[in-house]
Amino acid sequence: MLEKHLWRDFMAVTSSVAVLGLGVGSTLPLTALALTARGLGPQVVGWMAAAAAAGGMAGTLASPRATIRFGRRRVMLWCVAVAAASVIFLQYVDSLWGWTLLRAAFGVSMAPLFVIGEAWINSLPGDAVRGRVVAIYTTSFTLCQVLGPALTDAVAHAPHHAFLICGAVFLLGIPGIALARDPPAAAARAGYRATIGDKNAVASWLTIVRIAPAIVAGAALFAAFDNIMLSFLPLLALDHGFSQSRALAAVIVVFMGDATLQFAAGWLADRFGHARVHRTAGVGLCVLLPLLPLMIAVPGVWELYLFVLGGVAGSVYTLSMVSSGERFSGAALLRASGLIAFTWSLASSIGPAATGIVVQHFGGEAMTAVLWLMALGFVLAEHLGSRRPRAI
C-alpha cells in the first residue's frame, strides 16, 4: 500500500500517536471518576472536559505556523512533554481552578500532536489506498484508547499514584516521534506550497469549510461522541446498577468496535466511494443512537450494540480524515487537519458541557439526544457538500 521508504515514517508516527491514545483514554474517565469521588456532579465533569477542549482550540490555531517554523518532529516532542506534565500535576493540585488550568494545558499540548500526526499520515498514501492506510492509523490509535479505561480501572485502586502513572504513559510516545524523518526546514516550507494533481494546496480555513463541510461536521460528531462516551457512559452504567469495572468495560466495548471496524470502513470507502460510505455511516448513527436507553437493559445485546455503535461512529471520523487527504495537499492539508482538530476541540468543549447540563436535568439517557442532533447535522452537511464542486 505504501512505498518501502514511507513505512518507517508511518510506523513511527502511528505508534507514537497510538500511545497517546492510551493516555487520553485513561485520563478522561479517571478525571471523571476522581471528580465524582469528591462529590461533584456531572456538570463539573462536563466543564472539566470543556476546559481541555478549549485549550485544544488554542493549540490547533498555533499548530500550522509552529510546524512550518520549527518542524513537525520538534513540535510534537515539546507537546508530549507538556501533556505528560499536565496530567502528572493533577496528582498534587486540589483546587478546581488548578485542575481547570491543567486540563486546558493538556488540551493545548494534545491538539498539535493530532494536527501534525494526521496531516503527516495523510500525506503518505495515494488516493486508491487512502481509506485503508488512514484506517490502520485510526485503528492503532483506537486500540490503545480502548485500553485506557482498563488502565483507569487498574490505577483507580492506587489513587495516590493514579495520575502519575497515566502521565508517565505519554512519555512512551517520545521514541517513535524521534525516529520519524523530518525534512530540512527549507524543503518542508516548499513542500507545504506544492500542488499535487488537482488537489488544493492553498485553500484557506473558510474555503475548506465551504467545499468540504462534511469534514468539519464529521470531526465534530465523533469528537462529541468520543468525549461524551468516555465521560458519561460509565456514569450512566453506574446509575443502572453496573459495577465500576462493568461500567468502564462498556466504554471499552464501544472503542473495540471503533478499532475493529475501521479497516472494513476504509476498504468499503476505497471500493465504493468515500462520500457514499461516509453518508451511510451518518445515517446508521442516526438509527442506532435512539436505541441506547433500550439496549442497556438487555445483557448480551447491550455489548453487541455498543460494539456496532462504536464502529459506525468511528468510521465517520476516519472518512473525514480520508476526505481531507483526497481533496487537499501541502499547507491546505495541514490546515484541513488543523480544522479537524479545531472542530474536535470545539465540539469536545460544547458537547460535554451541554451534555452535563442535559444529564443534570433529564437523566443519563438524555445524552443520546445531544449526539443524535449532531449526527443529523452531519448527514445534512454531507449532503450539502456532495452538491458543491471540489474547488472554489
Q: Where do the model's predicted regions map?
A:
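Symmetry-related core transmembrane helices of the 12-TM Major Facilitator Superfamily/SLC fold
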Residues: 162-178, 368-383
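Helix-loop boundary and gating motifs at the non-cytosolic
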Residues: 6-53, 214, 226-236, 247
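A late C-terminal transmembrane helix in Major Facilitator Superfamily
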Residues: 333-360
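Helix-to-loop junctions at the C-terminal end of transmembrane segments
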Residues: 59-71, 156, 261-273, 359
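Cytoplasmic helix-loop-helix junction between adjacent transmembrane helices
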Residues: 104-139
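Intracellular juxtamembrane helix-capping segments at the cytosolic ends
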Residues: 112-125, 314-328
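Paired small-residue
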Residues: 97-105, 300-308
